[in-house]
Every structure is written in C-alpha cells, then in structure tokens.
Amino acid sequence: MATKIAGGLHRAQEVLQNTSSKSKKLVDLERDTADAHTQQPLTTDHGVRVSNTDQWLRVTNDRRTGPSLLEDQIAREKIHRFDHERIPERVVHARGTGAFGNFKLKESIEDLTYAGVLTDTSRNTPVFVRFSTVQGSRGSADTVRDVRGFAVKFYTDEGNWDIVGNNIPVFFIQDAVKFPDFVHAVKPEPHNEVPQAQTAHNNFWDFVYLHPEATHMFMWAMSDRAIPRSYRMMQGFGVNTFALVNKEGKRHFVKFHWIPHLGVHSLVWDEALKLGGQDPDFHRKDLMEAIDNKAYPKWDFAIQVIPEEKQDDFEFDILDATKIWPEDLVPLRVIGELELNRNVDEFFPQTEQVAFCTSHIVPGIDFTDDPLLQGRNFSYFDTQISRLGINWEELPINRPVCPVLNHNRDGQMRHRITQGTVNYWPNRFEAVPPTGTKGSGVGGGFTTYPQRVEGIKNRALSDKFREHHNQAQLFYNSMSEHEKLHMKKAFSFELDHCDDPTVYERLAGHRLAEIDLELAQKVAEMVGAPIPAKALKQNHGRRAPHLSQTEFIPKNPTIASRRIAIIIGDGYDPVAFTGLKTAIKAASALPFIIGTKRSAIYADGEDKTSSKGIIPDHHYDGQRSTMFDATFIPGGPHVATLRQNGQIKYWISETFGHLKALGATGEAVDLVKETLSGTLDVQVASSQSPEPVEWYGVVTAGGKQKPESFKESVQILKGATDFVGKFFYQISQHRNYQRELDGLASTIAF
C-alpha cells in the first residue's frame, strides 16, 4: 500500500512538473537524474542486483547467531558509502537552502554592456538561487540574527555568471586579507565552541570595535534586516562593485540589487528566538511551501551605474564594500525580474554541492579594484576545490548549459572524457583555439578592460577608505521609529551576552556615541556601561531613501502566500469558518486549521452522525503562533472550550505581542477581549453587532455571522468597511508597529 501511495504521489508530481516548459538547465540535469520511486530492483554501485539488504552475511544455526563475515561485499559497500557521505561544510554560509527559477530581462542595457544576459530581452535565463545564514553550522537554526546569503547562478548562453550577494548591501571589512580574522571572531569562541550562530559574544564585538570600518555593517546587522520574515521578503545585493563594458569599450561601475515583490519584512526578536527552537527549519520550509503552492517568489533586478569618469565625484570611495551608493545620488534602474518556481529534487547534489564564485563572470562584465572583491575572487574558487575537488565545475548543478571545451585535464573525480591526441595550445591541429582579441564583444571571448593603473606598491588603501561614520549615521537616521527601537533592543541584547566589561563598555559608551547619542545612552544604561554625556561625533542629520524597510510595502496591498491560522474546536461557527477560509484561498494566502485535536471536529449543530467533520491541519500543541502571520477565531459554542485552555489564551497574547493581525467573530470576540484586557482597554465590536471594529490590528465583529459578510473576492484597501477587508488589510501591512510604539505590546505576557 505504501509503495502504491508513494508511486501515485510521484506520478502526480511528474504531471505537475511537466505542465510547464523546462529550462535548459533542468533539461541538462535530467541525464543525471534517477527515479527513486521505480520498481527497478536494488543494485550495488557496480550494478549487481541485491537479493537481501537487511541482514549481514553470517554463520548461524537453529540455536544461535554466529559471527558476521567480512566477505560480505554488499554489506561492506553499504557501510563504506555511509561512512563517507559527509563532505566539508562551507566555512561560512553552511546553513542554506535553494531553488530553481528563471531570469527575464525586461530592458536591454546595451548602452552599458555587451553581455547577452543583460542585452537580449528574448532570453529566459535559467538560474539557481541559494539563500543562507553566514555564521552557523549546517545544523543551526534559520531564524538567528545574521546576514543572509543571496547567491544567484545564471546559466547563460555565454557561461555561468554568479552574483554572490547578501541581504545587506555592505560588509564588515574593506580588505579581504582581514576575512580570516573576521570569521574567526564571529564564529564560536575557540576555547569552548560557544555560541553557535550568534554575534552575541565577546570576540565579535571586540573585533568590530577594533575595526571602525565595521561600524556601518554592524548597524545593519542590529537592524530588522538581520531577522527576515522569509527569504522571499528580503532584498539582495551584490555588495561588491563590478564593471560593465559596452561594445564601444566604455566602462561603467555597477552595483546589483534584488527587490522582492512581496516587500521587505522581518520577524520580531522574541519571535525569532522562539522559532529557533520551535521550528529551526522555518525559512527553508517557507520557501518550499510557497513554491509548492505556486506562490512563486519574485524579485525585480536593478542596477546602480556610475560612469568611469565620475568615479571620484563622491565623498566615499565607490570601491569600498563598507559603503552604499545612496539612491538619491545614484538612482536604481530596474531592468529585469527573477522568479523561483521549482524546488530541488535532492538536497545534497543540488543545494549542498552548488558552488558560487565571484570570479564567474561573462563577457561584458568585469572586475574592479574593489579590495574585498579581489580577495573573494581568489578565496571562493579555492574553497570549492577544498570542499568538492578540482573538478567541481563538472558536477551537474555547477556545469554550464553552453558548450565547455578546453585543455584542462585529469584531477580527482574527472567525469569528462576528451577525445584527441593533443591537450595543449598551440597545437599542430589548431584545435580548441582561443578567440583572440578579434573575437571579443558580442558572442566572443572574455576580454579584460584595458584599465590604466599607476601608483606605488604598498600595503595601504586610499584616503576615502578611512572614513567610517557618515554612512552608519545615515543608516540610523533613515530608520523609522519602530526600527530604531528594535535596534536599541538588539544592541542591548547582544552586549548583555558579553561578560568582558572592556567589550561592552567601549562599544556602548564610545562607538555608539559616535553614531547617535540617544542610542548610545539607552544601550549603555541597559548593559551597565558608563553613560556618555555627549556625542563623540556630531550626527550630520542626513537621511537616504530605501534604507528603511517601511519604504518597501507593496503599492497594492496583498496577503499572497501569508500563513493564516484558524483556531477551532467542536461547535465552531461554520459560516465564519468557511467564509474566511474561502476568502483566504481566493487571496492566494494559505489557511491552516488549528484544532483542539487533529481528529474530526464538528461545526455547531453537527456531530458524527450528521457530518464527517473537518480534520485540522494541526492541533494547537503541535504548532505555535510564531509560525503564522495572523490568527482568526470564529465564534460558536466552541469558544467555551477554548476559554478553558491556557495555551489558546497564550496563542492570542503572543499574536498580539508579536504585533500580528488578530481576527475574531461572534463569541470569540469576548475571548479575545478577556485575554488582552488585563492591563489594556481593548476596543472590540459589540457582542450583538456584526459591524466590524479595528483596534491596533485586532479586527472583530460581533453577533451571528451571515454568509454575505464573507465575500470570496476581497479588494484589500486601507479604508475597507467589511470584516474580511479590514482583517486582510491588517495582514497585508505585516505588523501593527503602532501597537508597540504606544506601549501596548509590552503590557502583555507572552
């Protein structure tokens, strides 16, 4: 039976996958893909069929079991393969997940480059994207406070192009030679291997204080950017400065950006902490779930461009990876769109073995003298050799879709068989020739831009690299009030975990006082550092667009792909339940039924003799409010049961404390009011009135609900007057931060 079910599921999956056209890369991978659900007999790795894989060959008789025999080559192979399944994990970005998709160019930038992927709007370029955390090991949690990796591999007709980016546009260091020291400092401390996947320890904060260049970056790391709600709701940045070269040989400096269609949203810190234990796979499951439900994540692809002749026109060095190019100075130009639409078939050979290199560029794109990029170009290629071997680019997930032919040979795990008698250039057959400089340009070989270089060989950076505070101030000034509040709390949490007074006293009392005095004073008071009396550097007061996440709310409110919990017990109101569930699905969101049990639950007026009931997706003890974007409780007699359950009340309180939308109808309105009214004057709908009331993101409607109150198709508007419209609008805003700013959330125990 299990085999039949598995086979049926697999066939259904195949049908779904075959309904859409496959990209060149997916077709390429098919030759290395095997079906694990087939009835084909089990074999050894050398192709011999296996008759028994459950018992080791041994000496036995009727009375006892004797010794196992070493001659059992099948058992030995099975154990040998198991013993060698693991490979070295990535030193950084070890914890990650990935998906396939497509990149579509919307606007040709032929004025800037001759790269086909950025000039040919008829192309649909296959991509593989890997999201990751930076600090933790493969087994760490998804929701830690950390930078997120956002690496994109384009399988272009001219070769693979990798944008090895992050969800934060700057980095901690300017020069790649400091990378080993930085990673040593951010990783668990060497004497006890503690803490895992956290910056909240002495060594990290010691390092960043002693490296003022890290100031801008750690401001980002203490912001909400470091605890994203979803990989689908975070920006991506190329971090480094690259160059674009056009057919005329003119060079422009460029930075790459990814902007999510769903907006840029984050968890709250208490929620992130709890999810680390409740669902450590939260982000990877969220991505897979969205793709499985055809809520395909999308990002706009944008560039910032500076002509070569204007390189020196800014107060900062445009090659400094610890600096952004403010958008009011260098506007974004949106030119394409990325969509992720297929999950991996097997994690290890695809997500774990995928390898990205900043040195993977295609003709029309070039490197710059960005000192961090220069070192990354060496390090990334080198680390792939360590992890995967010298022939790592022959692995299915890494190989290009365009022809590959050269004179490279041999090495461990070489796959390709090359015919012919020569393996060098030049050769008497003129076989496999380089294109030469005449072949550069569109469709030709890679040609390095002929950059003029002059200077003195020494170990130094130019003068503009020495300024480290202006953009840190710019970032903090640009935050909204709730974002600033979250940053104060983040610094206070992190430095509270530092037990060396030298570390937290100078960071709070000195470095932060160079950014913002009020921030420094608040953090110093919380962590027990001397409170600075004056700013150590005058704040310039400038702000910049698109640094605050509040500027990325979608223009048209949407709840697409949002996870909404509906809590029910025996005796729930079927009208409100069915009406809202239907409306949620119609809005492309995901309803999850949370029951008092995961067995049949009956609506008001039903029992097992008159109805099959509803089987919930989960029971309340198997999930937590942290795993959902909003919660709805319909009315009905079941509320009497819910009222007696402390965990349900905690669910309500936690939803409120985490600033999420909370909806209730009928008898459930009083349950919500009772739960939250300990210290609050909760404003809810009258128990007899169906007119909806919205109060700090809590949407209620009293009385018995009528079917016409729940429209299947709802236009989500700020001024909606119906219950569903009001509730959906609150969900679309992600969180009700005014609830926090007015001090309401802090009065609730959660």
Curated annotation (Swiss-Prot):
This is Catalase A. It catalyses: 2 H2O2 = O2 + 2 H2O. The lineage of its organism: Eukaryota, Fungi, Dikarya, Ascomycota, Pezizomycotina. One of its GO terms (molecular function) is catalase activity. PROSITE patterns: CATALASE_1, CATALASE_2, CATALASE_3. Belongs to the catalase family. Coiled coil: none annotated. The keyword Transmembrane helix does not apply. The active site is at 93, 166. It comes from the Eukaryota. Catalyzes the degradation of hydrogen peroxide (H(2)O(2)) generated by peroxisomal oxidases to water and oxygen, thereby protecting cells from the toxic effects of hydrogen peroxide. Keywords: Heme, Hydrogen peroxide, Iron, Metal-binding, Oxidoreductase, Peroxidase, Peroxisome. Residues 30-49 are annotated as: Disordered. Its cofactor is heme. InterPro entries: Catalase, Catalase_AS, Catalase_clade2, Catalase_clade2_helical, Catalase_core, Catalase_haem_BS, Catalase_immune_responsive, Catalase_large_C. It holds the Pfam family Catalase-rel. Its EC number is 1.11.1.6. It is found in: Peroxisome matrix. One of its GO terms (cellular component) is cytosol. Its main location: other. It is an enzyme of class 1 (oxidoreductase).
